[in-house]
Amino acid sequence: MTASADIRLSDVRFSYGETAMHFDVTITGGEIAAIVGPSGSGKSTFLNLIAGFETPQSGIISINGVDVTHLPPADRPVSMVFQENNLFAHLTVEQNVDLGRSPNLRLNEEDRKAVASALARVGLQGKEKRKPEALSGGERQRVAIARVLVRERPVLLLDEAFASLGPALRHQMLDLVNKLRRETGMTVLMVTHTPEDALHLDALLIFLDNGKIAAQGPATEMLSRAGPEALRHYIGEMRSF
């Protein structure tokens, strides 16, 4: 069982090009949060700061009360799934998941049981020996999620992980992640260009604009007619295309 972990960004500042970003927010352990906002608003940077791929110029990032601001990514209790390039093409499904337990693919019996269990939980029984090229886009992302499970980290970051999937398959993947979150207690943060995903998950919605948190709250409230004007304007612009 994965323990829950609060995530705290305290007065975190970071500059990217001409964009000065400032984040001050707490995500409660076990919660699922959707990060939305215009292109260039800082969504991926927000996740990269938590994962350790970027280092803030000031402020503190803590996970479960531990300051991780200057820890390298490998030492943080975080797993991350991207839209592409999550798998090694020359390895089988099983071997790609094995990497979550052992970088040199040397697994003991307990590890192998964990891998088999993870593959079963994401619906990939019988496909262990296939290579990624033989899988659909949704199946490849299921492999990535299985690897997250065997790593047993309390925080999962999804950077537009399901953006290339059609609506029905994307909802299947979101439902899978939400089911696993409830089972394990992990904290999930996901970047999405589809605010309706937050409604589908009944998630906390964090709206970024120009490198700052412009608004946050339950998706059902934020996406209602009474929601923040900046968010309603953003959604209106999206639907005009």
Curated annotation (Swiss-Prot):
It is an enzyme of class 7 (translocase). Keywords: ATP-binding, Cell inner membrane, Cell membrane, Membrane, Nucleotide-binding, Translocase, Transport. It is found in: Cell inner membrane. Its EC number is 7.6.2.15. ATP binds at G37, P38, S39, G40, S41, G42, K43, S44. Pfam families: ABC_tran (PF00005). One of its GO terms (cellular component) is plasma membrane. The keyword Iron does not apply. It is a peripheral membrane protein. It comes from the Bacteria. It catalyses: thiamine(out) + ATP + H2O = thiamine(in) + ADP + phosphate + H(+). InterPro entries: AAA+_ATPase, ABC_SmlMolc_Importer, ABC_transporter-like_ATP-bd, ABC_transporter-like_CS, P-loop_NTPase, Thiamine_ABC_ThiQ. Residues 7-235 form the ABC transporter domain. The complex is composed of two ATP-binding proteins (ThiQ), two transmembrane proteins (ThiP) and a solute-binding protein (ThiB). PANTHER family: SPERMIDINE/PUTRESCINE IMPORT ATP-BINDING PROTEIN POTA, THIAMINE IMPORT ATP-BINDING PROTEIN THIQ. This is Thiamine import ATP-binding protein ThiQ.
